[in-house]
């Protein structure tokens, strides 16, 4: 069984590399296809996470994309994003782990974008915006996600298309040994 898992991981990695090299661009990529690819990659890494697109996270991603496209300064951007994600005490996401990330979509297909999100530690609890606040908790298996696109610039000032992703997962108490 271990050998089969290793073989599956190698095949999936090869497929991702092939997709990265032959992708036709990121604008035709759907949230559902990214969610499916992220679920496959998480399973290949041994993580028990299923990514599911949801309107609430899509709206959060849309608001962040609008903020980023509006050329907000870094100092104001952090506080504005924190307010959008609403994870402080009494907030909508108070009891959810909340992750965000961005990726340049030009020349990246579904697997390429999903790989970037997974590779940037979207599964690490400590990388969640509120990971320290929820220390000692674990993320539920279902991870809800939403994405939005905006036009930005790379480090050289070239125009690029950027995808914002927002992922949430309910914070749960870890199961104690001997308890059901």
Model-derived features: positions:
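Serine/threonine-rich low-complexity intrinsically disordered regions
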Residues: 13, 27-33, 54, 73-77, ...
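A well-ordered secondary-structure block
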Residues: 89-179
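Short, well-ordered surface patches within globular domains
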Residues: 26-91
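N-terminal low-complexity, intrinsically disordered segments
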Residues: 2, 25, 103-104
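Bacterial Sec-dependent N-terminal signal peptides
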Residues: 1-11
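Ligand/cofactor pocket segment of small-molecule handling proteins
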Residues: 16
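C-terminal motif of bacterial Sec signal peptides marking the signal peptidase cleavage site
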Residues: 19-23
């Amino acid at each position: 069984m271990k050998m089969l898992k290793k073989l599956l991981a190698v095949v999936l990695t090869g497929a991702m590399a092939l997709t990265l090299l032959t992708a036709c661009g990121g604008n035709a990529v759907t949230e559902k296809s990214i969610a499916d690819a992220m679920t496959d990659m998480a399973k290949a890494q041994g993580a028990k996470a299923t990514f599911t697109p949801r309107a609430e996270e899509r709206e959060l991603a849309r608001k962040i994309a609008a903020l980023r496209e509006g050329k907000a300064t870094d100092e104001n951007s952090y506080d504005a994003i924190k307010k959008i994600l609403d994870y402080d005490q009494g907030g909508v996401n108070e009891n959810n782990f909340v992750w965000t990330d961005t990726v340049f979509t030009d020349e990246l297909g579904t697997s390429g974008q999903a790989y970037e999100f997974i590779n940037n530690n979207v599964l690490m609890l400590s990388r969640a915006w509120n990971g320290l606040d929820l220390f000692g908790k674990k993320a539920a298996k279902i991870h809800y996600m939403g994405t939005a696109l905006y036009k930005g610039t790379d480090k050289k000032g070239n125009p690029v298309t950027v995808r914002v992703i927002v992922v949430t997962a309910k914070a749960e108490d870890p199961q104690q040994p001997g308890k059901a």
